[in-house]
């Protein structure tokens, strides 16, 4: 073949392979870009539009199936709309499911009255939903959430604690800043360091700084160690009921979680072992009288626009769904 003809054919092939967009979605696309302040280069715009459209149509199909009773939760377009699921998992999840020093083991209370529902938000234990940004620091937000709750239980004062302090300063304990970490390592840092600064004094940047700027005079919390829970939902329920919010890790790597909006989250593909995201259980409850409608109230760190005002109801007592009881722990204060 004549080389020039070959190049012409190749270029025509590329042109014909360019994505064809659904013009009926133009207004929604432009609105989404404006809402989330997206500015793309010429070469990226088409690719991102194609990813966004694919996600939009997947969400619409899921919600049609929800209306037919096939799912127990809805999905919605959100800030992750132009990300493939692979990108989403790389950027947003940062729990490192690695071997580490264990804490004390939780001793389940034998005679405690365990209520059918608990919500520590109503008791003042929980700070507003935060946003980790595009930094794999979920572990830090889960850890501060549990420590904020335990400090409130001890002092009666709710103080927002510094995730950036943990991101910058806990590498000696095994954490890797925006590249991931463990809540237990964060609790160990607070004990080793003798304190953790307040959010106000050490604000969140959403990036690695390589410099620890901890100021002892701004410390707003301390801990004496941490306790690991047995890998059972009943143990998690007893801990949440009697102690307050508990740090947990889950498998959050699915598109169904990426675009979760409301209802009780259940995905049959969710793993109880492959954990990638640190979150905070702040309570539990049930809908109606059906025993299958029990849920955990889980605080996420993707901002209040995601999910149920920043929270997700996760299926409870469904064989440790998404591994919610696999790596649960809390700090002792």
Swiss-Prot record:
Residues 1-17 form the signal peptide. Zn(2+) 4 binds at residue 210. Zn(2+) 5 binds at residues 251, 254. Its main location: other. Zn(2+) 2 binds at residues 163, 199. Zn(2+) 1 binds at residue 122. InterPro entries: Papain-like_cys_pep_sf, Pept_asp_AS, Pept_cys_AS, Pept_his_AS, Peptidase_C1A, Peptidase_C1A_C, Peptidase_C1A_papain-like, Prot_inhib_I29. Zn(2+) 3 binds at residues 184, 228. It catalyses: Specificity close to that of papain. As compared to cathepsin B, cathepsin L exhibits higher activity toward protein substrates, but has little activity on Z-Arg-Arg-NHMec, and no peptidyl-dipeptidase activity. It holds the Pfam family Inhibitor_I29. Disulfide bonds join 135-178, 169-212, 270-322. The record marks 106-108, 112-114 as: Cleavage. Glycans are attached at residue 222. The active site is at 138, 277, 300. During export along the endocytic pathway, pro-CTSL undergoes several proteolytic cleavages to generate the CTSL single-chain and two-chain mature forms, composed of a heavy chain linked to a light chain by disulfide bonds. Autocleavage; produces the single-chain CTSL after cleavage of the propeptide. The cleavage can be intermolecular. Its EC number is 3.4.22.15. One of its GO terms (biological process) is proteolysis involved in protein catabolic process. CDD domains: Peptidase_C1A. One of its GO terms (molecular function) is metal ion binding. Dimer of a heavy and a light chain linked by disulfide bonds. Interacts with Long isoform of CD74/Ii chain; the interaction stabilizes the conformation of mature CTSL. Belongs to the peptidase C1 family. This is Procathepsin L.
């Amino acid at each position: 073949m004549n080389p020039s003809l070959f190049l012409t054919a190749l270029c025509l092939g590329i042109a014909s392979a360019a994505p064809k967009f659904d013009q009926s979605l133009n207004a929604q696309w432009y609105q989404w870009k404006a809402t989330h302040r997206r500015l793309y280069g010429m070469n990226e715009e088409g690719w991102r539009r194609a990813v966004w459209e694919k996600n939009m149509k997947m969400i619409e199909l899921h919600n049609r199936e929800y209306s037919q009773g096939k799912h127990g939760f809805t999905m919605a377009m959100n800030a992750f709309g132009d990300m493939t699921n692979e990108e989403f998992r790389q950027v947003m999840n940062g729990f490192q499911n690695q071997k580490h020093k264990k804490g004390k083991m939780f001793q389940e209370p034998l005679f405690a009255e365990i209520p059918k529902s608990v919500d520590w938000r109503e008791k003042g234990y929980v700070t507003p939903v935060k946003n980790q940004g595009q930094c794999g620091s979920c572990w830090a937000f889960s850890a501060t959430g549990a420590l904020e709750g335990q400090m409130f239980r001890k002092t009666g004062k709710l103080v927002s604690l510094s995730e950036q302090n943990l991101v910058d300063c806990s590498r000696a304990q095994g954490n890797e800043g925006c590249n991931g970490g463990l809540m237990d390592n964060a609790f160990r840092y607070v004990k080793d360091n003798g304190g953790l600064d307040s959010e106000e004094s050490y604000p969140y940047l959403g990036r690695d700084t390589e410099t620890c700027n901890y100021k002892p005079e701004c410390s707003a919390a301390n801990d004496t160690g941490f306790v690991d829970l047995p890998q059972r939902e009943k143990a998690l329920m007893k801990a949440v009921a009697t102690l307050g919010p508990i740090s947990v890790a889950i498998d959050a790597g699915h598109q169904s979680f990426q675009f979760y909006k409301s209802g009780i989250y259940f995905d049959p593909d969710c793993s109880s072992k492959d954990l990638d995201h640190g979150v905070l259980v702040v309570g539990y409850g049930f809908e109606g009288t059906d025993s299958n409608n029990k849920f955990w109230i889980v605080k996420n760190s993707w901002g209040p626009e995601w999910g149920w005002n920043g929270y997700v109801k996760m299926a409870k007592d469904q064989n440790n769904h998404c591994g919610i009881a696999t790596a649960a722990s809390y700090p002792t204060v």
